[in-house]
Amino acid sequence: MAAKDEKFGNEARIKMLRGVNVLADAVKVTLGPKGRNVVLDKSFGAPSITKDGVSVAREIELEDKFENMGAQMVKEVASKANDAAGDGTTTATLLAQSIVNEGLKAVAAGMNPMDLKRGIDKAVISAVEELKNLSVPCSDSKAITQVGTISANADEKVGALIAEAMEKVGNDGVITVEEGTGLQNELEVVKGMQFDRGYLSPYFINKPETGVVELENPYILMADKKISNVREMLPILESVAKSGKPLLIISEDLEGEALATLVVNSMRGIVKVAAVKAPGFGDRRKAMLQDISVLTGGSVISEELAMDLEKSTLEDLGQAKRVVINKDTTTIIGGVGEKQAIQSRISQIRQEIQEATSDYDKEKLNERLAKLSGGVAVLKVGAATEVEMKEKKARVEDALHATRAAVEEGVVAGGGVALVRVAGKISNLRGHNEDQNVGIRVALRAMEAPLRQIVSNSGEEPSVVTNNVKDGKGNYGYNAATDEYGDMIDFGILDPTKVTRSALQYAASVAGLMITTECMVTDLPKEDKTSDASSSPAGGMGGMGGMM
């Protein structure tokens, strides 16, 4: 086991504080409409430029191990806020820095660290309740645009694009961000249910100019099994041929004579047919087949349910207005399933999302939810260079997370005003002793930090502006972009309540633990063991040279 280095008391806390300040000072320059960029060096390729707090935080590692421990703990604040709400990382870092700085001053002055932490926790619990009271719902397109604009560093086009995407696919719809090929941002919306399985044979293509299969008002056969024997399909093929409608077959696999027969029938025009593999694997494939059956009003032919493909009828088949298949994807548009059944399935998936423990499972369940409830929107980010592309993509992703958070829990006045108002409302809060009261004051002072930093980054005097805002009421605040005072809601400066709440809670949680730290332990640096020159191969060669 490696030897350890230890530091105690004030010496440990000073080291930790230095690390906190190094990281927070690098992150906080990005805050607000006039926040600056940070350039991050990469081990290969061009440096990246960002205004995203968590991206800056992740890059910081300090040489001194004790200082680095302080920096890593604040990095945890930024990461947690990012995971919870997708934004607010800079605010969370700033709040943590303020609480740690003010808290450690109080500890140095002789206050009890545990009582300080209790006071901070008490203030944060009350502040969260007040934030909920200040919050207003964010449901209309205008408010969503404003939230997206603020989070995308005052880029109105990004805000409008996100609002348009949410309008088209619904609040539960999947919106993904990709790198585009042009200079302009683009929005691509896929209506209906799309899954990543293409046609099993190019001979099914009936639109050679575009290389796709298009089926109008088709029947849809869903089978949770491999189909290789053509005989078990003959009854259903004959029924479909008599109806004059096309047929889409979705199965675990289709091979051998079954596939060959379908291709021949399709090419001769006897029955218009196409086949694709079922999406997903294992249990997820069964669930997705069930989703398709609910959407199209059919049944999944499954041997587990003692259903026989040979005995299936037209009533077992689903239907849709249109199906489009290319070599990679299948899109089912206008499924004729009952609305009540679809809503019931959506509720079931929502319940599964709440119970899911892994991020991967949640992501896949959200994709299924979106495909059932509306569709998928793809935001394609345009830029002139790769460096700009990466920076812009990160901003768009932040804005998307912020708008989702706003729809979920509502919005409050932005620009640091909400926390200042909350601090004013709970200024009379008291603890069980004077040390707890100091902890409460530490938290209240920290709630002013975001406003002070926004003002500082815009080149104005923080104390003057903060006092002016504190003297105002309601949504009255300072617009750093235009250097004027007024109603922040009217200015369109909004923050999602969830983002502000998460930032405050995670900052107080980690900062409270740091204030109560009394000892820090880390590995001692390993010494380089250099071999003696006399034992090196070169020494031996020298001896040989002397013999000659």
Swiss-Prot record:
Any one Gene Ontology BP term: protein refolding
Enzyme Commission number(s) of this protein: 5.6.1.7
Residues reported in the UniProt entry to bind ATP: 30-33, 51, 87-91, 415, 479-481, 495
Annotated Gly residues bias: 539-548
Any matching Pfam family: Cpn60_TCP1
Function according to Swiss-Prot or TrEMBL: Together with its co-chaperonin GroES, plays an essential role in assisting protein folding. The GroEL-GroES system forms a nano-cage that allows encapsulation of the non-native substrate proteins and provides a physical environment optimized to promote and accelerate protein folding.
Protein name: Chaperonin GroEL
